[in-house]
């Protein structure tokens, strides 16, 4: 029997604050989390985070390099906190990544395999960032994948649409939160 984990990726205060065009997003994501908790689905969180001074970041990295010299996504940054509307429950695993994909710089794969998890349900911000990268990484690691299309957000609605309708279906089942929670 397959064991499943719902991954909530990069739903951190600073990131959520940039995506306020869909006020129902967090409540929809909360419904997915509640559905997982009510079933036999592990809920895991992935968050971007660095040590003070960002020693893990190369100045050549166009995404993370500009953070060097700031407190961005360190323990001193309140914006690095997972949004309280969808915060982890006691015992939920939280994986801190150092790059875009959920597997980069984490022990996520080891933890999933050690728990016998074979199926992943992916949510998060952004569709063209952590979700896309994690779909590719997880597919290459032979996980069975589901992406909750409205459990993901992107700054570009057209990019989100193309990814969830034309790209992800090649490697994952794509469902809405309502479809997943009613299955």
What are these regions (language model features)?
Residues 5-12:
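Acidic-leg catalytic submotif of subtilisin-like serine proteases
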Residues 12-18:
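Short acidic, Gly/Ser-rich segments with clustered Asp/Glu that frequently serve as metal-coordination loops
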Residues 11, 48-50, 150:
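Active-site loop/turn elements of alpha/beta-hydrolase fold enzymes
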Residues 1-5, 31-39, 64-183:
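Active-site-adjacent betaalpha module
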Residues 19-36:
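…and closely analogous acidic/polar surface helices at protein-protein or active-site interfaces
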Residues 56-63:
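Short, flexible, mixed-charge acidic loops at enzyme active sites
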Residues 36-55:
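Von Willebrand factor
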């Amino acid at each position: 029997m397959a064991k499943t984990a719902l991954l909530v990726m990069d739903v951190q205060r600073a990131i959520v604050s940039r995506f306020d065009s869909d006020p129902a997003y967090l409540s929809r994501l909360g419904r997915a989390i509640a559905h997982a908790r009510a079933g036999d689905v592990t809920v895991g969180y992935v968050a971007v985070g660095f040590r003070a001074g960002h020693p893990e970041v190369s100045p050549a990295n166009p995404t993370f390099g500009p953070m060097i010299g700031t407190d961005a996504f360190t323990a001193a940054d309140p914006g690095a906190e997972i949004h309280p509307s969808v915060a982890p429950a006691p015992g939920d695993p939280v994986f801190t990544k150092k790059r875009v994909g959920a597997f980069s710089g984490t022990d996520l794969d080891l933890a999933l395999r050690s728990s016998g998890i074979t199926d992943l349900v992916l949510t998060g911000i952004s569709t063209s960032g952590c979700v896309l990268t994690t779909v590719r990484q997880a597919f290459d690691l032979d996980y069975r994948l589901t992406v909750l299309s409205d459990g993901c957000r992107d700054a570009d609605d057209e990019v989100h649409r193309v990814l969830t309708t034309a790209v992800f279906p090649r490697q994952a089942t794509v469902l809405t939160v309502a479809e997943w929670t009613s299955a």
